[in-house]
Amino acid sequence: MNTVRETIAAIATAQGRGGVGIVRLSGPLAAKAGLLITGRTLTPRHAHYGPFRDDEGLVLDEGIALFFPGPNSFTGEDVLELQGHGGPVVLDMLLQRCVQVGCRLARPGEFSERAFLNDKLDLAQAEAIADLIEASSSQAARNALRSLQGEFSRRVHSLTEALIALRIYVEAAIDFPEEEIDFLADGHVLSMLDAVRSELSTVQREAGQGALLRDGMTVVIAGRPNAGKSSLLNQLAGREAAIVTDIAGTTRDILREHIHIDGMPLHVVDTAGLRDTDDHVEKIGVERALKAIGEADRVLLVVDSTAPEASDPFALWPEFLAQRPDPAKVTLIRNKADLSGERVALEQCDDGHVTITLSAKGDDTGLQLLRDHLKGCMGYEQTAESGFSARRRHLDALRQASEHLEHGRAQLTLAGAGELLAEDLRQAQHALGEITGAFSSDDLLGRIFSSFCIGK
């Protein structure tokens, strides 16, 4: 039997007790199930209040039945919703009644999967449903809603259309050599290619912000021993997460703390103090710290503002320069302002990094500057009309598309190889297609939808 033609059923509301609970059905038996359970033929898109009965006519519950005939439904199939009381026992009895009339229990995400397979939404929109449900902040929810409404997909579709136009031009020139089109002399190909690369870069940047809002930003606190790193972690966490002493090298290993700032998730990593040491255990801690720095979304480089070397903090640890991300991802924290007498402030430096002067010992003003700065790094200041949600797999696909475009451009400019450019353009289009599901393996679809809630 084709499983897509089976009628599926699941409880669509959250587990636990509540005022209302919903059982959702999708498939060819939806109308028949409505008749058998309610005792009446349901008018499409009308609310029918009445009893829900078992196979012997006994009342299981009372509530509202709604029938949506396909293709004008969420899944594109006939859909029935039974809205009753939100007790788990009542809902389970109602679900078992649906199984009695011929339904099977739905797999996690199967309703959204059917909507995707029936072209009611694309893969990015389907994933946005889960992102909206799991959103941990109002900004993340707004971004997920915009993706659900198709904003991310429209951006990807626009890039795909531009790639198709470029492929047509390039492949036509290859297939009809008598036209003698010189790709480089013509200039049209490079112009179109650079325009696509520019727009792709913009989408990558916005998708990166969307992924941070969804998954949380990894913030690594780094610096010399006794710079106040652990004190800063404790202030951000709002509790004594790390041991703080005056003994240099107290923190010898990675310490992770998951926190929220106004609902926005951050994964804060405290690290061992960066210094040369003969202590084997501490040396391992320093190596782990440098590794964490290289993997961070944001690095907080903490310096003791009372130390003589604080005037040139990036010279404190030469290996830090090799491990740190883009300078724009480094925030310099000049700590212990209460001792140095420096003014609490935030400054934007010429090389792209931000400097915040504060005291990690109860300086509310400086700590609020840091919190606001971290929210800004995650895209908190986006307007309701900008941004969209994205996942790591989307970022990987965008990166692959960008790499193919870069490689294709190099093949064209260095070797004049139009055939190789055409292949890179095809690969870039394929990578973008994986975002919306235009090109997706069954294994990928299975992994994505299996992570959804049952009933979604």
From Swiss-Prot:
Domain TrmE-type G span(s) in chain numbering: 216-379
Binding site for (6S)-5-formyl-5,6,7,8-tetrahydrofolate: 24, 81, 120, 456
Keyword Mitochondrion: no
CDD domains documented for this protein: trmE (cd04164), TrmE_N (cd14858)
Bound cofactor: record note: Binds 1 potassium ion per subunit.
Classification via Pfam families: MMR_HSR1, MnmE_helical, TrmE_N
A single cellular component GO annotation: cytosol
Domain of life: Bacteria
The EC number(s) this enzyme carries: 3.6.-.-
Keyword list, A-Z: Cytoplasm, GTP-binding, Hydrolase, Magnesium, Metal-binding, Nucleotide-binding, Potassium, tRNA processing
UniProt cross-references to Gene3D superfamilies, sorted A to Z: P-loop containing nucleotide triphosphate hydrolases, Probable tRNA modification gtpase trme, domain 1, tRNA modification GTPase MnmE domain 2
Compartment(s): Cytoplasm
Essential cofactor(s): K(+)
Binding annotation for Mg(2+): 230, 251
Amino-acid positions noted as binding GTP in the UniProt annotation, renumbered to this chain: 226-231, 245-251, 270-273, 335-338
Any one GO MF annotation of this record: GTPase activity
Any GO BP annotation: tRNA wobble uridine modification
Record-linked InterPro entries: G_TrmE, GTP-bd, GTP-bd_TrmE_N, GTPase_MnmE, MnmE_dom2, MnmE_helical, P-loop_NTPase, Small_GTP-bd
NCBIfam families in alphabetical order: mnmE_trmE_thdF, PRK05291.1-3, small_GTP
HAMAP family: GTPase_MnmE (MF_00379)
Quaternary structure note: Homodimer. Heterotetramer of two MnmE and two MnmG subunits.
Function, as annotated: Exhibits a very high intrinsic GTPase hydrolysis rate. Involved in the addition of a carboxymethylaminomethyl (cmnm) group at the wobble position (U34) of certain tRNAs, forming tRNA-cmnm(5)s(2)U34.
Family of the protein in this entry: Belongs to the TRAFAC class TrmE-Era-EngA-EngB-Septin-like GTPase superfamily. TrmE GTPase family.
Protein name per its UniProtKB record: tRNA modification GTPase MnmE
Organism whose genome encodes this protein: Pseudomonas putida (strain ATCC 47054 / DSM 6125 / CFBP 8728 / NCIMB 11950 / KT2440)
Underlying gene: mnmE
